[in-house]
Amino acid sequence: MGRFIFVSFGLLVVFLSLSGAEDDSDCPSDWSSNGRFCYKLFQQKMKWADAERFCTEQRTGAHLVSIESNTEAAFVNQMISENIKKTDYVWIGLTVQNEEQQCKSRWSDRSSVSYENLVKPNSKKCFVLKEYEGSRKWFNVYCGQKYAFMCKFLRPR
């Protein structure tokens, strides 16, 4: 009986270690995982459109990062703060698009804008993350500037 319990416990440990919910193995080795997505920060500086195109060329379904929750924002901010100076901007996938005389924000991956962290909106059309009052917030800036950027894609199953 004791041997059966020992073997059963051993199999349970092996099963749990192989089925980790946040396993990075589904993301390429140089990408980070969070939930169902893979992320990578690129420090080379590009214009917004060039950065978006670069992301789409990295992986199927990849785009500039969309941020859909406070939890995801914290993850993205942590990645950036570990690799980018506080004063540097980082492109995200949000843009303002004119649709039928109405300005509307949209993520480049077409996901809905359900979470916002915008500071001081103005007439510029592209968005960056910038240090503001102790954390990174969204600012809209001129799309032709060159900044670092982060890409994101849905992890393969």
Curated annotation (Swiss-Prot):
SS bond list: C27-C38, C55-C151, C126-C143
PROSITE patterns named among the record's database cross-references: C_TYPE_LECTIN_1 (PS00615), C_TYPE_LECTIN_2 (PS50041)
GO MF annotations, alphabetized: toxin activity
Tissue expression from the record: Expressed by the venom gland.
Top-level division of the source organism's lineage: Eukaryota
Ranges of residues in domain C-type lectin: 34-152
GO biological process terms held by the UniProt record: blood coagulation
SMART domains the UniProt entry points to: CLECT
Compartment list: Secreted
Keywords: Disulfide bond, Hemostasis impairing toxin, Platelet aggregation activating toxin, Secreted, Signal, Toxin
One annotated Gene Ontology cellular component of this protein: extracellular region
InterPro entries to which the protein is assigned, alphabetical: C-type_lectin-like, C-type_lectin-like/link_sf, C-type_lectin/snaclec_domain, C-type_lectin_CS, CTDL_fold
Segment forming the signal sequence: 1-21
Job description of the protein: Binds to platelet GPIbalpha (GP1BA) and enhances platelet aggregation at low-shear stress. At high-shear stress, blocks platelet aggregation in a dose-dependent manner.
Family: Belongs to the snaclec family.
Subunit structure: Heterodimer of subunits alpha and beta; disulfide-linked.
Protein's UniProt name: Snaclec mamushigin subunit alpha
